[in-house]
Amino acid sequence: MSENIRESISAKTLSKDQMETSYVSLKTWIEDSLDLFKNDLLPLLYPLFIHIYFDLIQQNKTDEAKEFFEKYRGDHYNKSEEIKQFESIYTVQHIHENNFAYTFKNSKYHLSMGRYAFDLLINFLEERNLTYILKILNQHLDIKVYVGPKSEERPQGIETSVVDAEIDLTTFLVSRECEDAILGDEQYRYDHLETYVLQLRKQREMKPKDSVYKPNASQIHAEIEKLKDLCKRVAVNKNNLPSICCYTIHNTYEGLTAAEISNDLKLMACGFKDSYVEVYSLTNESLKKLKSSSELAKSDIKTLNEEKFEEVGSSYKLVGHSGPVYGLKFFSSNKFLVSSSQDCTVCLWSLDLLCLLAVYKAHAFPVWCVDVAPNDYFFASGAGDRQAIVWSVMTSKPERLIISSLSDVTAVKFHPNSSYLFTGSSDHRVRMHDISTASVVRIFCGHTDTVTCMDVSHCGKFLASGSKDRTVLLWDIQSSKLLGKYVGHENTVFSVSFCFYGSVLASCGADNSVRLWDRTDHKGGCLGTYYTKNTPLLCVKFGYRNIISCTGPFIS
């Protein structure tokens, strides 16, 4: 902070009335100030409010602290998620046991303020002899004073360490095994797919980086189909916007809690408040289920391949959870589906057998989100216990426990090279973790409310995040710098998606709309807005051919 602030610490312990009077005096002055300065000054009140509350608790004035807290918490409705975490704190021990409260108390709170507004603030505090407020400013706030227009957006909030660890964002579209399968197959000889793969192989030789996890036959088949679709993709940009297909789910009776579309846009899964998952076919083909071993034993060996599956219709219910389903994700091979629930578990389902394969237990609170690594070997979950857990399909025990968030982990996303995991939290931050060490390698600060969704560009260089603050933020992963802020949604953003080989970014949310943005336009101009009649959209996804699919429940 500026040297203009002198360190003034009162020698005597202030009473609750004196603390409250100081807070109210400053609050009234800020609310009566000119609009030109009010936006700079208003953010001061929240950290002051919390630190006064903590000071009263440290003086063992529990009743007075709660009275002060309840009286003025309404002034900070935009911080409702954080306020909820503080309302259960009554003693000094609670502060030490609550990770978020302890960090808030012992870290600097960042703010930006214009020079003139800052000078007015200091003059007011000195004229009114508000030395207690000055003490809090000195000890707990870090105010960056700027002159002239605000040159860049500086995140507000508690201090986080600047992480600048070395990271490798090298990303390949498909595995080496998939490339080998295509180049070694006669049916692709002199085909456009062979030419495409030869270009990919040149990129791989320039930056060799092989995964230790080798794909199986079904994964290689899925990657070949992916390349076939990519070869037929539509070029999309601000002058050539993509087509959008919306799937509306009727008669949910407000019971739909999650929805997900597969990467190839052929399957859709919905999670419900009634604890079940329903899988839908988005093509003309029926869902198929592998016959039981007794039925297969009766089949003719010559026709076994054609008869080993039986059709079960266009949808199928999967029952296994004991609470509302909050997260869903398909494996890239479409052979498996992973789901998370309020029952604190993660379930792995087989889409060949259409049954539950495994239940993963380690979380102590509801599991809000899941994601599957592109290599189909790892998947991750985030929960209300502030943990993200990386799991392996080979074992039911956690591979990594990632404990870095100060609040609920509400979104998880793997990097395309499967080496890093991004977590979004109710503490408004996105963190990037190295899976091999579980350490934080990047922190992205910019949202002002809970992070709800993320997506990483297919080149592995850019991150998009959506939030309850109704914005979509675009980040450069290497430098962790904010590239663009896209404003337009009128309610929570539920899903974001990058196109393939283009600059278009799609988002959808609770305002019943899909919005398209230009990734290269960092000023945040919207390319197009498409409204549904009355359907909040839970998922939006670019397919391999750059056609968008989205889904949500019809609210009658």
Curated annotation (Swiss-Prot):
Compartments reported by the entry: Nucleus
BP GO annotations: transcription initiation at RNA polymerase II promoter
Keywords: Nucleus, Repeat, Transcription, Transcription regulation, WD repeat
Superkingdom of source: Eukaryota
A single GO molecular function term of this UniProt record: RNA polymerase II general transcription initiation factor activity
Segments annotated as WD repeats: 251-291, 320-359, 362-401, 404-443, 446-485, 488-527
Primary localization class, coarse: nucleus
Gene3D superfamilies to which the protein is assigned, alphabetical: TFIID subunit TAF5, NTD2 domain, YVTN repeat-like/Quinoprotein amine dehydrogenase
One GO cellular component term noted in the UniProt record for this chain: transcription factor TFIID complex
CDD domains hit by this protein: TAF5_NTD2 (cd08044), WD40 (cd00200)
One Pfam family linked to the record: WD40
Main function: TAFs are components of the transcription factor IID (TFIID) complex that are essential for mediating regulation of RNA polymerase transcription. Regulates the genes involved in ubiquitin-dependent proteolysis during the progression of M-phase of mitosis.
Subunit (UniProt): Component of the TFIID and SAGA complexes. TFIID is composed of TATA binding protein (TBP) and a number of TBP-associated factors (TAFs).
Family of the protein in this entry: Belongs to the WD repeat TAF5 family.
Protein name: Transcription initiation factor TFIID subunit 5
Organism name: Encephalitozoon cuniculi (strain GB-M1)
